[in-house]
Design a protein with these regions (language model features):
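Membrane-proximal cytoplasmic C-terminal regulatory module of class A 7TM GPCRs
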Residues: 2-15, 44-79, 323-326, 410, ...
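Transmembrane alpha-helical segments and their boundary/interface "anchor" motifs
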Residues: 90, 94, 133, 137-140, ...
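Aromatic-enriched alpha-helical transmembrane segments of multi-pass intramembrane proteins
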Residues: 97, 220-386, 456-460, 465-469
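Membrane-proximal N-terminal segments immediately preceding the first transmembrane helix
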Residues: 35-81, 112-124, 231-239, 363-369, ...
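Membrane-interfacial alpha-helical segments at the cytosolic side of multi-pass membrane proteins
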Residues: 149-155, 260-273, 307, 430-442
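Membrane-interface helix-loop-helix regions
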Residues: 15, 25, 45, 49-69, ...
Length: 510
């Protein structure tokens, strides 16, 4: 869709020399017709508006066009074939996990009791496996493995090629930019959130925070959130007590991401010059130690590094080469059945209810909780031993399954991957300002239908139709103007700090 150009508009809208000319008529012309003609001759011409007004209108239309081009949704934008690489599935995994985290918070708006475990007679969506799409803690465990994998890919590839100087340069650059990459969007959303609280835009907040009563107190609150929140060294395994978490609960993961990333960079720096066997052994020893002490977050990041090292050692063939080896129908069926059976225990563990909501009648969850090692017993929900084990299993299953890789490389899932970070940070604010309002408008109307669960389902469908476009479009805009600008700023700051001159424009794909 394009905004019409000023030059395309009708001539009478421009400051041209177009004039109204009287139509020729004779004395036999009807009086009514003559009256119409005389009326038209009295209408003001376009030139009466003046050149300044014309310029203002033209500028306004041009601005509208630029605004539309900058913010139009992806679905309305032209796009060619997407270029994929062997690990594009990581973006898909991250995107789908972020989408599930949104659902885990969205159900709190009206269906918070659904977070509890399934009991006999409950709705089937509360059963294990079915509840995976709103099981947030397990998705966070997946996040951290994917992050460890992604940030390890290039330096490990260089280490295997014995390009030690490039490994060092890569780690220096990654370490410098990682903090900016993570904290720049957080600072932006703290400012946005502070404005929302100061302007009382949240729908029926549980309580009005006194720190947002005045503009000055709101600014001071932002400072108290951002400055201490940058410190990743004060986090404990149970509560991850970051000030970001106090301001907006989902932001607790950001300091954890930064700390885990730095640990991965240091570990790769240590093992980069070692032989391949020694490097793999060092990673295994590190994982064993982290398992013994229950340091779950670092364990997940290092596990991502380990999975990346395995990926490089395997040197996977392309999907086309792989598919030619499995053209036999029977082998395809066997592989599909095996994949399905492998996914069952993984999704079962990832969909375990949070401790505060109890496990319901699913006795196996209670058994697993009772048999959790002491070093892991006091971790937060995302740090549960069994969730972490399931997240690790999922990543390795996708690594070895071309079928799952194709799913996570599909265009809709890749789209979620593109906006995953902003979707994760933005959705709580959209839920508190727009989502709750929609719920309190839609469901009183659908409840009047008196059809029980059917009425509730109709309300859910209407709610999703209204809210999802807002969520996706908002995430796209935030990705373009916050996330990518943060990446650009990190590169700019790195160039200025190290005195590096790079060509202007986006970096070339490596």
């Amino acid at each position: 869709m394009q905004i019409p150009q000023w030059s395309d508009l009708a001539p009478w809208t421009k400051g041209s020399a177009a004039q109204y000319a009287p139509l020729a008529h004779d004395s036999d012309t009807d009086e009514v017709e003559s009256g119409l003609l005389s009326t038209e001759k009295r209408l003001p011409s376009a030139t009466a508006r003046g050149p300044i007004t014309n310029k203002i209108v033209a500028t306004f239309l041009a601005l509208l066009q630029q605004l539309w081009m900058a913010t139009r949704p992806v679905i309305l934008s032209p796009h060619g074939k997407r270029k994929l690489h062997p690990t594009s599935w990581l973006d898909g995994v991250r995107g789908l996990a972020a989408f599930f985290v949104f659902f885990s918070h969205g159900i709190d708006v009206r269906w918070s009791m659904s977070r509890g475990g399934w009991t006999h007679g409950d709705f089937f969506l509360r059963m294990p496996i079915f509840r995976i799409f709103y099981s947030g803690p397990g998705m966070v465990s997946v996040f951290f493995i994917v992050s460890g994998y992604a940030i390890s890919y290039k330096p490990l590839l260089l280490a295997r090629a014995r390009e030690q100087s490039k490994v060092f340069d890569c780690l220096v650059s990654s370490t410098f930019r990682r903090g900016v990459r993570l904290y720049f969007p957080c600072a932006a959303f703290v400012i946005i959130g502070a404005l929302i609280k100061y302007c009382h835009l949240e729908y029926r907040p549980k309580k009005t925070d006194p720190r947002a009563e005045s503009l000055l107190s709101t600014i001071w609150w932002m400072v108290q959130v951002i400055i201490p929140g940058l410190n990743p060294l004060t986090l404990d395994r149970r509560w991850m007590n970051s000030t970001f978490k106090d301001f907006e609960p989902v932001m607790w993961t950001i300091p954890v991401e930064f700390r885990g990333s730095v640990c991965v960079f240091i570990l790769i720096l240590v093992v980069a010059k070692a032989s391949r066997a020694m490097r793999l052994g060092a990673l295994i020893v590190s994982l064993a130690y982290l398992t013994c002490v229950g340091q779950w977050d670092i364990f997940l990041f290092v596990m991502g590094t380990f999975a990346c090292e395995i990926h490089h050692r395997r040197q996977l063939p392309t999907h086309d080469e792989h598919e030619t080896k499995t053209t036999n129908v029977f082998s395809r069926v066997v592989r599909s059945i095996g994949l399905f059976l492998a996914l069952l225990p993984i999704t079962f563990l990832l969909s375990q209810p949070e401790t505060m909501w109890k496990n319901g009648d699913v006795w196996l969850y209670d058994w697993l909780a009772a048999h959790t090692p002491g070093a892991w017993a006091n971790n937060m929900e995302a740090g549960s031993l069994w969730r972490c084990a399931a997240a690790v299993s999922l990543i390795f299953l996708v690594e070895y399954s071309s079928t799952l890789q194709k799913f996570f490389m599909s265009r809709p899932i890749q789209y979620l991957g593109d906006i995953s970070f902003m979707l994760y940070l933005l959705h709580p604010w959209l839920l508190s300002t727009i989502g709750k309002r929609l719920v309190h408008i839609i469901f009183p109307l659908t409840d009047k239908l008196g059809w029980g669960m059917i009425s509730e389902t109709i309300g859910v469908v209407i709610l999703l139709i209204c809210f999802m476009p807002i969520l996706f479009w908002g995430s796209e805009i935030a990705t373009k103007f916050i996330d990518r600008k943060g990446v650009d700023f990190a590169r700019w700051a790195e160039d200025r700090f190290y005195g590096v001159q790079r060509p202007i424009g986006p970096p070339k794909a490596s």
